């Protein structure tokens, strides 16, 4: 490929609304162009990266036995009404009507459509297992699209869906996809972690996220450096930091804490460690009658240590809270505690509440909590003596760096990541909702066991740049760079020798199957080099009259600090060797 035949449009400055590095660099490198809020044109340079990402995904999905199809972007609402998601999903689901006033959706995902295909086509156990995948445009009407393609409204994803006859077979399909994903991300050349995750809105029983490591990542990844344990912050298990509850050494006392409504302020006032304090969080659950009105409200008091934070995903797994919860209103808090938020605690309640203690709090002795009176806290509180044991003890907090690893193999560390892939074992959630059955050996209908497996194709680009960039531009791994090698001739339009050498190298590398760009635009060396460093081509060869007279050319890897000289006659072999290493 020659630059004069391609489209290159770089910018010296990023647009003012580009907040993160990936957005800034993709705009400057001419890879994307904004069309509307969260909607981008993928320009030729960016599209080349997308196609390389897709090619790797296709190769590994096919290798794993998945079969490609293509499902539509516009889907009839009837299928989504079967699963209830047409009404359950919020405004992120773009709903439209056709000229006949029929409801459709612009797909954010395709569980309903693929399950409809399966229930029509996969009728016998002999046809199972089966795994369908597609690479397709999606749309989610994000309330606040930002960060360029990292949180856009229109994007491209690879979605795969497995169908199996039983849970054991489905687990094998899940494992096959998990292994395929590891091969895919290994080939991308990115640093990543596969972490256990919550199943979220999609539902199911087993889930892993594939996170690209980046300091700017929105997700917290928890892992143990000395074992294989890894999970996202929502799922990472927080063990009790106290092995056994100690004996009481203090009497409970009501202590003035004027104007100190946070655990940190109270600990500072009393000159005690923050870990001695306990914070109170008040939730509520509502039971509805047949008319849909609230028939009964239960108030819950959740207790976590003062230096810890509540984990809402874990809270949602506590018995009594699984059906959903909300934060209690100020009126509900005052009626049960006789006090406004800021000084709440489990002692001296006006009305009974359900008390859930985090594992660590349940083992604490001589702790500090609100006195249910403005400007007062209680010190020296002990379970059993000053208040009953909690109604339940559960893991309801986020882990923190340095916590013991749940597998007992060390301590936990936390790093930031960008989710680019997710695998779910769905079970029969969708097959039951849509009556997707097959006939077993005895001719009896059985619900298919399902899994779903997604990769954010366009999101990969942003995540890769967030992980790999420097002051000059993007640092693409070889496998997904728009071009692998760029030949930069100085004086291409003035020197016959330079032109001949550049053309010959370009042709030889291209014949060897290497994705090579020859910059024949006649740009000044500084501007030419700056463009390709910004775009992030991994390997650069510079050919000049001066070098050729000495029988040499210059080679520089994008991550190399300086260029090295290579005999002109050996440069093609040298570059091929670098690509193999």
Curated annotation (Swiss-Prot):
It catalyses: tRNA(Pro) + L-proline + ATP = L-prolyl-tRNA(Pro) + AMP + diphosphate. Its main location: cytoplasm. It is an enzyme of class 6 (ligase). GO terms for cellular component: cytosol. Keywords: Aminoacyl-tRNA synthetase, ATP-binding, Cytoplasm, Ligase, Nucleotide-binding, Protein biosynthesis. InterPro entries: aa-tRNA-synt_IIb (IPR002314), aa-tRNA-synth_II (IPR006195), aa-tRNA-synth_II/BPL/LPL (IPR045864), Anticodon-bd (IPR004154), Anticodon-bd_dom_sf (IPR036621), Pro-tRNA-ligase_IIa (IPR002316), Pro-tRNA-synth_IIa_bac-type (IPR004500), Pro-tRNA-Synthase_IIa_type1 (IPR023717). One of its GO terms (biological process) is prolyl-tRNA aminoacylation. GO terms for molecular function: aminoacyl-tRNA deacylase activity; ATP binding; proline-tRNA ligase activity. Gene3D superfamilies: Anticodon-binding domain (3.40.50.800), Bira Bifunctional Protein, Domain 2 (3.30.930.10), YbaK/aminoacyl-tRNA synthetase-associated domain (3.90.960.10). Its EC number is 6.1.1.15. It comes from the Bacteria. The keyword Cytoplasm applies. It is found in: Cytoplasm. PROSITE patterns: AA_TRNA_LIGASE_II. Catalyzes the attachment of proline to tRNA(Pro) in a two-step reaction: proline is first activated by ATP to form Pro-AMP and then transferred to the acceptor end of tRNA(Pro). As ProRS can inadvertently accommodate and process non-cognate amino acids such as alanine and cysteine, to avoid such errors it has two additional distinct editing activities against alanine. One activity is designated as 'pretransfer' editing and involves the tRNA(Pro)-independent hydrolysis of activated Ala-AMP. Consists of three domains: the N-terminal catalytic domain, the editing domain and the C-terminal anticodon-binding domain. Homodimer. Belongs to the class-II aminoacyl-tRNA synthetase family. ProS type 1 subfamily. This is Proline--tRNA ligase.
């Amino acid at each position: 490929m020659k630059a004069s035949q391609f489209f290159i449009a770089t910018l010296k400055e990023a647009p003012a609304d580009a907040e993160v590095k990936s957005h800034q660099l993709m705009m400057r490198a001419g890879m994307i162009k904004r069309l509307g809020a969260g909607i981008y044109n993928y320009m030729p340079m960016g599209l080349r990266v997308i196609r390389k990402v897709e090619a790797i995904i296709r190769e590994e999905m096919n290798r794993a036995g998945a079969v490609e199809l293509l499902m539509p972007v516009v889907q009839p609402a009837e299928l989504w009404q079967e699963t209830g998601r047409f009404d359950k999903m919020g405004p992120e689901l773009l709903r439209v009507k056709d000229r006949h006033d029929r409801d459709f959706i612009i797909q954010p995902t395709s569980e309903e459509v693929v399950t409809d295909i399966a229930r029509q086509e996969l009728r016998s156990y002999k046809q199972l297992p089966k795994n369908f995948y597609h690479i397709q445009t999606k749309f989610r009407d994000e309330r606040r699209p930002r960060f360029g393609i990292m949180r856009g409204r229109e994007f491209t994803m690879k979605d795969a869906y497995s169908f199996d006859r039983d849970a054991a077979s489905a687990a094998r399909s899940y494992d096959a996809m998990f292994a395929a994903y590891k091969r895919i991300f290994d080939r991308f050349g990115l640093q990543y972690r596969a972490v256990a995750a919550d199943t979220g809105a999609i539902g199911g029983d087993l889930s892993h996220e594939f996170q690209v490591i980046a300091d700017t990542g929105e997700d917290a990844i928890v892992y143990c450096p000395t074992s294989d344990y890894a999970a996202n912050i929502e799922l990472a298990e927080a063990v009790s930091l106290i092995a056994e509850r100690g004996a009481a050494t203090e009497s409970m006392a009501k202590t003035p804490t004027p104007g100190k409504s946070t655990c940190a302020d109270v600990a500072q006032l009393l000159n005690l460690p923050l870990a001695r304090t306990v914070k109170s969080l008040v939730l509520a659950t509502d039971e509805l009658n047949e008319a849909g009105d609230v028939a009964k409200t239960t108030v819950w008091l959740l207790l976590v240590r003062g230096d810890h934070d509540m984990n809402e995903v874990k809270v949602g797994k506590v018995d009594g809270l699984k059906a959903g919860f909300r934060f209690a209103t100020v009126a509900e808090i005052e009626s049960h505690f006789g006090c406004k938020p800021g000084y709440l605690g489990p002692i001296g309640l006006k009305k009974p509440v359900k008390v859930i203690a985090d594992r660590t709090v349940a083992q604490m002795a001589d702790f500090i909590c609100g006195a249910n009176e403005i400007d007062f806290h209680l010190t020296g509180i002990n379970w059993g003596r000053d208040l009953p044991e909690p109604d339940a003890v559960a893991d309801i907090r986020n882990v923190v760096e340095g916590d013991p690893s749940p597998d007992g193999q060390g301590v936990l560390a936390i790093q930031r990541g960008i989710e680019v892939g997710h695998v779910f074992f769905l079970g029969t959630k969708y097959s039951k909702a849509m009556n997707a059955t097959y006939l077993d050996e005895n001719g009896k209908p059985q619900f298919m066991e399902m899994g779903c497996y997604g990769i954010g194709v366009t999101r990969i680009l942003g995540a890769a740049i967030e992980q790999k960039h420097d002051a000059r531009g993007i640092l693409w791994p070889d496998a997904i760079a728009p071009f692998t090698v760029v030949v930069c001739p100085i004086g291409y339009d003035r020197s016959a020798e330079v032109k001949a050498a550049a053309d010959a190298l370009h042709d030889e590398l291209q014949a060897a199957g290497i994705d090579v760009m020859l910059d024949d635009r006649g740009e000044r060396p500084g501007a030419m080099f700056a463009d390709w460093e910004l775009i992030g081509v991994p390997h650069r060869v510079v050919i000049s009259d001066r070098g050729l007279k000495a029988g040499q050319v210059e080679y520089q890897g994008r991550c190399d600090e300086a260029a090295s000289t290579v005999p002109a006659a050996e440069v093609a072999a040298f570059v091929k060797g670098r690509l193999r290493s």
